[in-house]
């Protein structure tokens, strides 16, 4: 992979001194509303969503190399970032049309790579739902869409992070045993597709290739993969791309995510960091809604800090610098 000088500078801004991307993800919109709604009777307000993002940015970006935010509710938080922290902004609309299994990609209406760059971002992030077994017609439509985003990022000379969420059009429950059995192929084959230089992607943000809750030694109930099988899937994922790739936390607990990173490393995965979201900050939602800003800050300074500090310690032992790949 060849980087322009500007893209290299931007990636360095998003990384720590080791060349790892230890980024805090808080571009959640629909998921944040649902989390907040658990603790109050009224619809979460824009002001509440904006304020919590500001609090998390203010309290935790001093311990992260960068932060991912959304332009809908996250712009005030971009002003609260630690001066050393890089900024990624999400380009996609939240969620997808549940009346169809197509999960078509869609950019935010009044945003572009140019506007994201003008906002001070060091990278554009775009989320794509992708089923490698969908019709060629549907997947060509999705690929063309990603080509457009990639070309915009080339024009603006800004790094393009593609987040791939694999799914199966026939299986509605991504947490099921049924999906766990097909997940490795879905994740790995999608990574192969989008490693093609035609997409102009600089970093892939991906899921781990297994549902860890069904791995021998991690599973409480049914086991879908032995430890050896799971390790082979991590190896296959490593071989699937020549691009830097980072893991998303997919809403699992902080402890399970840390254990997963260790397992990935031990299996031979040379991942280049993480974009960790709810595993770090989700616990701040309840004190924020029930008790307000002060209680949320207290949670972030204690448990939130512990989550991110533990994660950073694990990263030092498990991640590889992205500079090895460029």
From Swiss-Prot:
SMART domains on file: DeoC
Gene Ontology biological process terms from the UniProt entry: 6-sulfoquinovose(1-) catabolic process; D-tagatose 6-phosphate catabolic process; lactose catabolic process via tagatose-6-phosphate
Induction: By lactose. The operon consists of lacABCDFEGX.
PANTHER family: SULFOFRUCTOSEPHOSPHATE ALDOLASE
Further comment: This gene was sequenced from pMG820, a laboratory-derived deletion of the naturally occurring plasmid pLP712.
Family named by the database record: Belongs to the aldolase LacD family.
Keywords annotated in UniProt: Lactose metabolism, Lyase, Plasmid
EC number: 4.1.2.40
Catalysis performed (reactions): D-tagatofuranose 1,6-bisphosphate = D-glyceraldehyde 3-phosphate + dihydroxyacetone phosphate
SUPFAM superfamilies found in the cross-reference section: Aldolase (SSF51569)
GO MF terms, alphabetically ordered: 6-deoxy-6-sulfofructose-1-phosphate aldolase activity; tagatose-6-phosphate kinase activity; tagatose-bisphosphate aldolase activity
Enzyme's top EC category: lyase
Annotated pathway: Carbohydrate metabolism; D-tagatose 6-phosphate degradation; D-glyceraldehyde 3-phosphate and glycerone phosphate from D-tagatose 6-phosphate: step 2/2
Pfam families: DeoC
UniProt name for this protein: Tagatose 1,6-diphosphate aldolase
């Amino acid at each position: 992979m060849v980087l322009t000088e500007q893209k290299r500078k931007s990636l360095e801004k998003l990384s720590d001194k080791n060349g790892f991307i230890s980024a805090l993800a808080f571009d959640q919109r629909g998921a944040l509303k649902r989390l907040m709604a658990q603790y109050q009777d009224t619809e979460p307000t824009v002001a509440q969503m904006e304020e919590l993002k500001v609090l998390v940015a203010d309290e935790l970006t001093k311990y992260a190399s960068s932060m991912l935010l959304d332009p809908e509710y996250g712009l005030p938080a971009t002003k609260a970032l630690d001066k050393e922290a890089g900024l990624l902004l999400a380009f996609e609309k939240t969620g997808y049309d549940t009346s169809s299994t197509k999960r078509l990609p869609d950019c935010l209406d009044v945003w572009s790579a140019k506007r994201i760059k003008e906002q001070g971002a060091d990278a554009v992030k775009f989320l794509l739902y992708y089923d490698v077994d969908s019709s060629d017609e549907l997947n060509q439509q999705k690929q063309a869409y990603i080509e457009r985003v990639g070309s915009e990022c080339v024009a603006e000379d800004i790094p393009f992070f593609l987040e791939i969420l694999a799914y199966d059009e026939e299986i509605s429950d991504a947490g099921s045993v049924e999906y766990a059995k097909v997940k490795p192929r879905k994740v790995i084959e999608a990574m192969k597709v989008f490693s093609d230089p035609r997409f102009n992607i600089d970093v892939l943000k991906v899921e781990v290739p297994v549902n860890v809750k069904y791995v021998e030694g991690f599973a409480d109930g049914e086991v879908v993969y032995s430890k050896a099988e799971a390790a082979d899937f991590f190896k296959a994922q490593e071989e699937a791309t020549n691009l830097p790739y980072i893991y998303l936390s997919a809403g699992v607990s902080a402890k399970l995510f840390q254990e997963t990173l260790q397992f990935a490393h031990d299996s031979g995965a040379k991942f280049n960091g993480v974009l960790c979201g709810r595993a770090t900050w989700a616990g701040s939602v309840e004190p924020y809604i029930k008790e307000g800003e002060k209680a949320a800050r207290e949670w972030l300074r204690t448990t939130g800090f512990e989550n991110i500090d533990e994660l950073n310690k694990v990263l030092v032992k498990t991640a590889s610098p992205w500079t090895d790949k460029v």
